[in-house]
Every structure is written in structure tokens, then in C-alpha cells.
From Swiss-Prot:
Residues 1-20 form the signal peptide. Disruption phenotype: No visible phenotype. Mice display significant deficits in object recognition and spatial memory. It is a multi-pass membrane protein. Expressed in liver, kidney and adrenal gland. In kidney strong expression in the renal pelvis and the ureter. This is Adhesion G-protein coupled receptor F1. Disulfide bonds join 532-559, 547-561, 655-731. Residues 147-255 form the SEA domain. The Stachel sequence (also named stalk) in the C-terminal part of the extracellular domain (ECD) functions as a tethered agonist. In the inactivated receptor, the Stachel sequence (also named stalk) is embedded in the GAIN-B domain, where it adopts a beta-strand conformation. On activation, the Stachel moves into the 7 transmembrane region and adopts a twisted hook-shaped configuration that forms contacts within the receptor, leading to coupling of a G-alpha protein, which activates signaling. Residues 566-574 are annotated as: Stachel. GO terms for cellular component: plasma membrane.
Length: 908
């Protein structure tokens, strides 16, 4: 049995004069054209013609090879002088069971790493020989065949970019192409295996030239040889062109390579012209995933003509003129299905201008005109255009809002006698209803249903109760809905949120209502925390003013609003709806109490600061306590500032400053807690060692403020240049796949918590022994009391409560972890005041004496005021020795290590 095989044979042919037969035979599968000049009069065109030759067995294949070697005479079917300069067999295929299996001939390979038809073929590279398998059913056109090894190169010519370089038929294009190719051929002609070089592209950025070298050796060998000749190639090019130094590059693998944009290395950015029939240009950037369009202004030439026509009739516009413009616009878009970024912007601009002129001249629109407008909107709201909308909104931030406003304005121009009307497109639904007596008894109902990506239907329902129409009747009610608007109207509110339902707009002209109900289907079931919102055209953002959530089920959300506009709902991902409100209130209440407690703590410390200096242990402890209180107070204030800043509205510098200072001062809190823990460990372990106070303080302040400042500055310097320092939704350190500066807070904080936990265990171990003189049955009780007091004091002072944050990270959906973490840390300032000040025996006694003194002074003042003759009285002054043992020695029989520990903890 014989199996039919297919052989692909490209022939390179030169022909002078007219294109003739060759151009007619070019089916677009793999045609290359190089323009040069011969004797300055006759352009020479080089074509690559692909022939598919079928053979049945290896013998026939050998016969064909011998034939191809002899094939040198011009083909008689070509008109005009012509010559075949090269014939090469590149790819062979065999058909098996409905599949086509193809492989490359010797010294050929697949470029780029796909084969034949990228849509219907799969390249297998795991075997000894890479093969291309295609389904014969879907195979249409072959694009990528086996080719010789390729090396790509690029360089810049330091000249202003002439627009004619985008026209391959121009003399300027021929001048640069021929000159560059001749110089490169001369430089590479001695390279082993070199076959050809051709200019593939010109791009803006001075003049950026891309070229391609083809050879018969392996790709690594060809690349190495071309790199060795780089200096010679640059010298040759500079004889004719001012090549920029440092711009010459060659590479064997192009991260980005496409027919439209050519090749480039990562982060290359170029401006290229739009395709034929469009005006404008595109800016593309090479990323790891390939070429990405960053800016685009490609507009159909017909749309530009329509803009000119509108400008000409603007002063004398009529209803017929509006109808004609809208009809022409609809026809143009139907004939050109491509929705470019430039086309989107132009269509929005045209419709907006038509709407403004119609309103200014009190024009009405016909049913046909309105239908054309809805068809145009349905075309540009295609979900396939969302990527282009995203690019457009980078420069024209109000484009989507302007389109929504325009559709509402044009809808208001339809006369009431033309209603009812209903237009249902794939991406927009429109319904106009004349108001009659029925609305007074039944109210108003609007229902829509759409599908997104063949999923379950997405529904929306608007209901206005009958009592809203009792006093008077409006003429019309118009409602429209779209799913696409939810993707293109920007989300500016803080937090991760998406529009999770259709956007529904309801218009009633010259009429006000006090209540409207809207029911939305959820697009994504895993989103929670629904918020009923409307689109604020003046602020260009979603707002919840006048709207409230009535009910939520598994699949729907019911909203109630007190005004009419465009409504939808915002929802956040993967956060239990019960967590955020509870934690939010705990945080705000806790921070308020903490700030007040910390201020009170600092006031008390300042009142009795002199008394704390009499003992080095007491003094160092209070210095740590004051710095913890100051840092936590400032950190809480900056936290509140960060919580009130909207990153999407406020200048980015404000948010960056809030993130930096919040990060710095919270780190300072932890590092001062570390200093406190180290000092406590020092007093426990090195009982008889005494360090100078200045040395202690130098170490303390370097750790307490130096380390946090260094970490904060490095974090900012490393991540801010790439705009990955802060989150986009809230003012706090970022956490994303590409950048995780939040680790600069989490890692130091949890490390310090772990260190301080060890210190607490040391304290408890030191306390776990009976005091001298106590009976055995009293030992356990006394020890337990001392350990309990110490643990109560040390837990908030050393930041151990932050360890519960691990629970929130391990199980973010557990309400208990979130509430516990918020309770313990939002009230941390209050705990420091209670356990650091009120449980401090000495400070408590000083405060008590101060209050007693004030009370005595008030009583004396009253007595003096009532007596006619007063006798001088001497108030009892505070005697620090009066309370000896209550602070310094809690157990007179303990060892010196216990005395020091008691002084430091001051809990007795």
C-alpha cells in the first residue's frame, strides 16, 4: 500500500517590471518581498513561492530532489525577465488517519516555535525529531514552515524618522533598505553558512531598524558567528548611516516576534503604523508574554471623513442630518468588524457630539435612528473589545462614562408617541415605555436577561411601586441594561471590588421619585459584601449615596434607591461578609480608646519622670515604655490617615507618605518591644553584670528607631520605582505575584514576637520556684500568682498579641481569628496603659499620693476660706522611702535575681 506524502518546495525568483503571474499566485501563506534598485530605473522584486509537491515513496522523493537541482532555467509561464536563484525543500508531511504529520528536512527547523497553521496544528518537540501534527478537518492555510536557522538584529540610526519609511513602495524605503542590506551582506559574507540578510522593519524611536540573517548552520553556530562579526557590521553601516553607539544588538531567540510588529527583546517599546485603511499609529511593548499594545490611535479613514462631515454641518444640523450621520456610522462599523482603540474613541466622540448638537437644537430622533444608535452601542460594547477599552481609558478616563451619558441623552430624544419600543442586542438591552394610568395601579416593571460566555443567564429587574405615580404622570420611562459597562466603568472605591451584576439605567424626564427597587443576578458567586451603588457622572465613580442593600440571597441582591440614574452593585472577593463590619467597628473603637490611653500614659509618665530616674532598672524600663507609647500613638494616627485616603482620588504622594510612616512607626513599636525584651533577658541572665546607662540607651535607640528607618527606606527605594510599593486599592504595603513589600513588615514583626516569646518563657522559668520561708502548700499558689501577673504585663508590652495574626493568615475565613486579632491589637494602647502604668506599683502609689495631695489642698482651701483667722498648716509631703519594699523588694527573702526581676516588672 502506498501512502501519499507532501513536500513543500519554496522557489526564490527574481523578476523585473510588472508583478504579473507571481503576485496573482501569492495566496498569503508565506510570501516575502524585497525591493531593491537596478540601474536606478527598474525595481527588482524578490518573491518566495511555495509549491506543494506530492510523492508516494522514498524513490519518488529522491527523483524530485534530483529534479530540483537541475531546475535553473526561467519558467515559461512567467511574464517578463525572470530568474530562479534558489530552490530548497524544507518540509515533508504524511497523512495518517485524518491527521497530517510534518517534519523538517536536514538543516531546517520551525520558526517561530509553532508550525503550519497555529490554530489547528501542534508542534511536538519531545521526540528525537520535532514534528508538527495537524487535523486535516480544520487545516486551512499554512503559515509557518520549516526554515533555515535565523538570527535577528536591531540597531538605531540617529536621524529623524521619515514617515515614508512606513511605505515599502517609497524611494526613501528603498534607499535605506538597499543600503543597509548591502553593508550587512558585505560584513557577513565570510560567515560560515551565511545565506541571506534582509531588513524586516523600520520603527519609530529615531530610526529603529530590524533585520534577519538566515544561514544553513545550526542556530547557536550562526548566532556565535554573527556575534563575532558585530564590530565589522557596525563599521560597515557607519560608512553610510549615523548608527547610534550601543544600539547594535543580535540575538538568536526573539522573546517577541509577530508578523504585525516584527521582533524585539524584552522591554523594547516601538511605535508602528496602523494597517491599510486606518490612520494613526500603535505603541507596542515587548513583555514576557509577547507584544502588548500600550497605546493605539488607529481610526478608520471613513470615520475621519465622518468627523469632518459633522463639523461642516454642526451650525445647521437637522433631524435628517442626524439620521444620515448615524446611519452612515452604523454602516461603516458593520462593514469593518475590527473594533480598534482609535475606533472606540472616535465612535464615542461622534455620538457625544451628535447628542450635544441634537439637545442644543431641540431635535428629536426617529425609531430608525435610535435603533442604529443601539446597534452601534451593541457593536462597541462587545465583550471582545474590553481589552481595547482598557487601553482607551488610560488616556481618555471618561470615555465609558461619556458613552453611558450619551446613550441616556439620545434616549431622551425619542418622542413619547413613538413608544413603546424595545431593542435587544447581544450586549445591550433597551426599552422605552409610555406612562399611562396602568402605572398608577401596577407600578413600573423592567426585566432583562443576558448571557455571559454561555453561562447561566444574568437577570436584572427594576420595580417602581404604584404610589410613586399618584400625584402626576411622567410621559415616558426608559430603561437600558448592559453587562459590558460593568467592566469598563472604572472602580475607584477602596478595596478589591468588582461590578458583579448588570448596569441598569432608568430615566424619567422632568419627574422625581422617592423610591426604586432593583434586583440583580450575581455574575460571580464567590464574591461577597454587596454594595448597592450608582454611577456619579460628576465624580466619575461609583457612589452608594441614597442606595442601600435590602436583601441578599445566594444568587441575587435586592437594592433600594431614592433617585434615578445608572445602578449596579460592587462586591469583594474571598472575604466572609460577616468579618469586615465586625472587625471594622472593633478597629475604629479600639484605636480611639488606644489613642486616648496612650496620651494619658504619656501625661502620667511626664508627671513622675524624675521619680523614675532614681533606679537604673526603673529608668530604662520607663524609657522603653515611653518610646513604645509614642511610636504606637503616631502609628495609630497614620493608620487612621491611611484608612481615610482614597488612592484612586488623592495624589499618589499622599498615599505613599501614609504607607511609609505607618510602616516605620509600627516597626518602631516592635523594635522598642524587642529592646524591652532584651533588657529583661539581660536582667535575668546577667544578674551581676552592670552596663553603663549611656551604652544601654545607644543600643536601644539604634534598635528602636535605626532598624525600622533602614527597613522602611530600603523597602521604599526598591519597590517604588516599579510602582509596586503600595496597593492600588488601599494605602498599605503591596502584596502581589510580582512584588511583596509587605514581607518587610510581617517578617520583622513576627521575628520579634518569636524572640520576645522566648524572653517570656525565661521569665516564667525564673519565677517557677518557691520564695524562701513559704510553706510547701503555699508555694504553688504564690508562684502561680507571680507568673500570672508577669504574663499579663509582658504579653501586651512585648507584642505577643500580634502572634494571633498567624491565625488570620492561615484561615482568613474564620471570624474568630479576625475578631480576636482585632480586639487584642486595636486596644493595645489601652492594654499598655493598664498593664504598664496602672499595674506599676510605684507609679500607682505616686499617682495615689498626688491625688491625695490635691484632695488635701482642696479641703485646706475650703477651710481657709471659711475661717476668719487661719493658722498655717503644713501639708504632708511625698516621701519615697515611705513605701520602700513595695517596689524594690516584694519578697525580702528572694535572691538578688528575683529582686531585679521584680524591679523590672513592677507588678507586686
Amino acid at each position: 500500500m502506498r501512502i501519499g506524502l507532501l513536500w513543500l518546495v519554496p522557489l526564490f525568483t527574481l523578476t523585473e517590471g510588472t508583478d504579473g503571474f507571481l503576485q496573482q499566485k501569492n495566496d498569503g501563506r508565506r510570501t516575502k518581498e524585497i525591493v531593491s534598485m537596478v540601474e536606478e530605473r527598474h525595481p527588482v522584486h524578490e518573491y518566495e513561492v511555495l509549491l506543494q509537491v506530492t510523492y508516494r515513496d522514498p524513490e519518488e522523493k529522491r527523483e524530485l530532489k534530483r529534479f530540483l537541482k537541475l531546475l535553473k532555467s526561467p519558467s515559461p509561464s512567467l511574464r517578463g525577465p525572470s530568474k530562479i536563484i534558489r530552490v530548497k525543500a524544507t518540509t515533508y508531511c504524511r497523512s495518517r488517519k485524518g491527521f497530517l504529520e510534518c517534519a523538517c528536512e536536514d538543516s531546517y527547523t520551525w520558526f517561530p516555535p509553532s508550525c503550519l497553521d497555529p490554530q489547528n496544528c501542534c508542534l511536538h518537540t519531545t521526540g528525537p525529531v520535532p514534528s508538527c501534527n495537524c487535523s486535516l478537518r480544520g487545516l486551512r492555510q499554512s503559515i509557518n514552515f520549516c526554515e533555515r536557522a535565523k538570527v535577528w538584529g536591531t540597531f538605531e540610526i540617529d536621524e529623524k524618522f521619515p514617515e515614508d519609511l512606513w511605505n515599502s513602495s517609497s524611494d526613501v524605503y528603498a534607499h535605506y533598505t538597499v543600503g543597509i542590506e548591502n553593508q550587512l551582506k558585505e560584513a557577513y559574507r565570510r560567515v560560515h553558512g551565511f545565506e541571506s540578510v534582509r531588513v524586516t522593519q523600520f520603527r519609530k524611536g529615531s530610526i529603529v531598524v530590524g533585520y534577519e540573517v538566515t544561514g544553513s548552520t545550526s542556530p547557536p553556530e550562526l548566532l556565535f558567528a554573527i556575534e563575532q562579526e558585530a564590530e565589522k557590521a557596525q563599521e560597515a553601516l557607519r560608512r553610510q548611516f549615523p548608527v547610534k553607539y550601543g544600539s547594535f544588538r543580535v540575538f538568536g531567540k526573539a522573546p517577541c516576534n509577530s508578523i504585525s510588529f516584527g521582533f524585539g527583546s524584552e522591554n523594547d517599546e516601538y511605535t508602528v503604523p496602523c494597517s491599510s485603511g486606518f490612520t494613526g499609529s500603535m505603541t507596542v511593548r515587548c513583555q514576557s508574554s509577547g507584544w502588548q499594545i500600550t497605546r493605539e490611535s488607529c481610526v478608520l479613514s471613513q470615520l475621519e471623513e465622518l468627523k469632518k462631515e459633522l463639523r461642516m454641518i454642526a451650525g445647521k444640523i437637522t433631524e435628517a442630518g442626524v439620521a444620515s450621520l448615524v446611519q452612515n456610522l452604523s454602516t461603516i462599523l458593520l462593514q469593518s468588524p475590527s473594533t480598534t482603540v482609535g475606533n472606540l474613541g472616535s465612535v464615542v466622540s461622534l455620538l457625544s457630539n451628535i447628542s450635544s448638537l441634537s439637545l442644543a437644537n431641540s431635535l428629536t430622533v426617529s425609531n430608525l435612528t435610535l435603533m442604529n444608535v443601539i446597534n452601534i452601542a451593541d457593536h462597541i460594547l462587545d465583550s471582545a473589545s474590553i481589552t481595547n477599552w482598557t487601553i482607551l481609558l488610560q488616556d481618555a478616563k471618561d470615555a465609558s462614562s461619556q458613552l453611558l451619558k450619551t446613550l441616556e441623552s439620545i434616549s431622551s430624544l425619542i418622542p413619547s408617541m413613538a413608544l413603546p419600543l424595545n431593542f435587544s442586542g447581544k450586549f445591550i438591552d433597551w426599552k422605552g415605555t409610555p406612562v399611562t394610568q396602568i402605572q398608577s395601579t401596577r407600578g413600573y416593571n423592567y426585566q432583562m436577561e443576558m448571557r455571559q460566555n454561555a453561562s447561566l443567564p444574568i437577570r436584572g429587574h427594576v420595580f417602581i411601586e404604584p404610589d410613586q405615580f399618584q400625584k402626576s404622570h411622567p410621559k415616558t420611562i426608559i430603561s437600558m441594561a448592559s453587562l459590558t459597562f460593568g467592566d469598563i466603568l472604572p472602580i475607584t472605591q477602596r478595596g478589591n471590588a468588582w461590578v458583579n451584576g448588570p448596569v441598569i439605567s432608568t430615566l424619567i424626564q422632568n419627574y422625581s421619585i422617592s423610591e426604586i427597587f432593583l434586583n440583580f443576578s450575581k455574575i460571580k458567586g464567590n464574591l461577597t459584601q454587596p454594595r448597592c451603588v450608582f454611577w456619579d457622572f460628576s465624580q466619575l465613580q461609583w457612589s452608594n449615596a441614597g442606595c442601600q442593600l435590602v436583601n441578599e440571597t445566594l444568587d441575587t441582591v435586592l437594592c433600594r434607591c431614592s433617585h434615578l440614574t445608572s445602578f449596579s452593585m460592587l462586591m469583594s472577593p474571598f472575604v466572609p461578609s460577616s468579618v469586615v463590619p465586625v472587625v471594622k467597628w472593633i478597629t475604629y473603637i479600639g484605636l480611639s480608646i488606644s489613642i486616648a490611653s496612650l496620651i494619658l500614659c504619656l501625661i502620667i509618665e511626664s508627671l513622675f519622670w524624675k521619680q523614675t530616674k532614681r533606679s537604673q532598672t526603673s529608668y530604662t524600663r520607663n524609657i522603653c515604655l515611653v518610646n513604645i507609647a509614642v511610636s504606637l500613638l503616631i502609628a495609630d494616627v497614620w493608620f487612621i490617615i491611611a484608612a481615610t485616603v482614597d488612592p484612586s482620588v488623592s495624589p499618589s504622594g499622599v498615599c505613599v507618605a501614609a504607607v511609609f510612616f505607618t510602616h516605620f512607626f509600627y516597626l518602631a513599636v516592635f523594635f522598642w518591644m524587642l529592646v524591652l525584651g532584651i533588657l529583661l533577658a539581660y536582667r535575668i541572665i546577667l544578674v551581676f553584670h552592670h552596663m553603663a546607662l549611656t551604652t544601654m540607651m545607644a543600643i536601644g535607640f539604634c534598635l528602636g528607631y535605626g532598624c525600622p528607618l533602614l527597613i522602611s527606606i530600603i523597602t521604599l527605594a526598591v519597590t517604588q520605582p516599579s510602582n509596586s510599593y503600595k496597593r492600588n486599592d488601599v494605602c498599605w504595603l503591596n502584596w502581589s505575584d510580582k512584588s511583596k513589600p509587605l514581607l518587610a513588615f510581617v517578617v520583622p514583626a513576627l521575628t520579634i514576637v518569636a524572640v520576645n516569646l522566648v524572653v517570656v518563657l525565661l521569665v516564667l522559668r525564673k519565677l517557677w520556684r518557691p520564695a524562701v520561708g513559704e510553706r510547701l502548700n503555699q508555694d504553688d499558689k504564690a508562684t502561680a500568682i507571680r507568673m500570672g501577673k508577669s504574663l499579663l504585663v509582658l504579653t501586651p508590652l512585648l507584642g505577643l498579641t500580634w502572634g494571633f495574626g498567624i491565625g488570620t493568615m492561615a484561615n482568613s475565613h474564620n471570624l474568630a481569628w479576625h475578631v480576636l486579632f482585632a480586639l487584642l491589637n486595636a486596644f493595645q494602647g489601652f492594654f499598655i496603659f493598664c498593664f504598664g502604668i496602672l499595674l506599676d506599683t510605684k507609679l500607682r502609689q505616686l499617682l495615689s499620693n498626688k491625688l491625695t495631695t490635691l484632695s488635701s489642698w482642696k479641703q485646706t482651701s475650703k477651710r481657709n476660706a471659711s475661717d476668719t483667722v487661719t493658722q498655717p498648716k503644713c501639708l504632708r509631703t511625698f516621701n519615697i522611702l515611705q513605701h520602700r519594699g513595695m517596689y524594690a523588694l516584694s519578697h525580702t527573702g528572694d535572691s538578688s535575681s528575683d529582686i531585679t526581676l521584680t524591679q523590672f516588672l513592677s507588678t507586686e
